[in-house]
């Protein structure tokens, strides 16, 4: 009985790690800005992200509000 309970707990733990998203949640504080433009032809302003990791993290966590990299540097 103990082995069965232990096995179930291990499987649940593995499933939790597999189901976890792979979004970067912690980015460095290096300020190497990138300008992003809304994906999919949305009509909203370009947005400056602190770095590429910030843009990637935003896109991963906000599937309906993604940005494509327009260029390095701040948006004008």
From Swiss-Prot:
Keywords: Calcium channel impairing toxin, Disulfide bond, Ion channel impairing toxin, Secreted, Signal, Toxin, Vasoactive, Vasodilator, Voltage-gated calcium channel impairing toxin. PROSITE patterns: KAZAL_2. Residues 22-76 form the Kazal-like domain. It comes from the Eukaryota. SUPFAM superfamilies: Kazal-type serine protease inhibitors (SSF100895). This is Vasotab-TY3. Residues 1-21 form the signal peptide. InterPro entries: Kazal_dom (IPR002350), Kazal_dom_sf (IPR036058). The keyword Disulfide bond applies. Vasodilator protein that inhibits vasoconstriction of isolated rat femoral artery induced by phenylephrine. Since platelet aggregation and vasoconstriction are key hemostatic responses, particularly in small wounds, this protein likely participates in the antihemostatic responses during blood feeding. Blocks L-type calcium channels (Cav1/CACNA1) in left ventricular myocytes isolated from rat hearts. Transmembrane segments: none annotated. SMART domains: KAZAL. It comes from Tabanus yao. GO terms for cellular component: extracellular region. GO terms for molecular function: calcium channel regulator activity; toxin activity. Disulfide bonds join 23-60, 27-53, 35-75. It is found in: Secreted. One of its GO terms (biological process) is vasodilation. Expressed by the salivary gland.
């Amino acid at each position: 009985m103990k082995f069965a309970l232990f096995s179930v707990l291990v499987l649940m733990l593995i499933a939790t790690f597999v189901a976890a998203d792979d979004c970067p949640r912690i980015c460095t504080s290096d300020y190497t800005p990138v300008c992003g433009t809304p994906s999919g032809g949305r009509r909203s302003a370009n947005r400056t992200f602190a770095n590429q990791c910030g843009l990637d993290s935003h896109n991963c966590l906000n599937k309906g509000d993604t940005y494509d990299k327009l260029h390095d540097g701040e948006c004008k």
